[in-house]
Amino acid sequence: MYLTQNLMVKVVQIFTIILFFSSCKSTKSLTSNQAQKQEVYQNKSIVFQIKSLKAINLEEDLTLADEIMLTYSLTAVDESNKVVQVANGSWGVESMKKGQIALSERFKSIELLLPFKGKILSSVILTEIEDYKKAQNTVKKINEFGGLGKIPAMFISLGEYETPLAIVFASLQAAGIGLKAIEHFDQDDLLGQNTFDLPVATLSSTQKLYPVNLTFEGEHFKNKFHYELVYELKITEK
């Protein structure tokens, strides 16, 4: 099916934003295709839960606190790398001081029905916020519409080397959250991004928990920041 003119404009806008942040270029742009159903286990889900976020060192020295937003997604893709199910969550905007820890009860979990084939991509983006009000509205909208798995009307195909930022954008777009809710990302400081790849074929009947430990560190205007993020993926059965 050919893209409509409006949809093409949106895709171009997303790709432009992605290029602004990406440390490496994708070999393929995001494209949309006619929706097709993917078989899923009706009694099995995969749940994403943040366990902790710790500020070891801050990006902002003058204010002695960073205004932080964490955005995360579960994206199910089929064997052709088409997005077939998405769930999104967000946390913030929170003022984090050096040494401060945010624990699991402060983060909303998200979940998907486990597909028979393909893979699950769990992606996280940590940003230091410039526009507080706009970011708060984004967090509210993502959490209002994105917590449970959704099958998009138009599937989005990911390129082979998409960044975590690109994957989260695709997941938000597939969930119908739209460009207006995520356009603030081009004004914020990206502190870290990561995607964990979990092929369905590699899942074990005995292993139910998949912990992910991440370190985000770097330098911005001579300020060295350092954050540690821990989350887990859990396979549940009803």
Question: Positions of the model-derived regions?
Answer:
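Bacterial signal peptide processing site
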Residues: 25-28
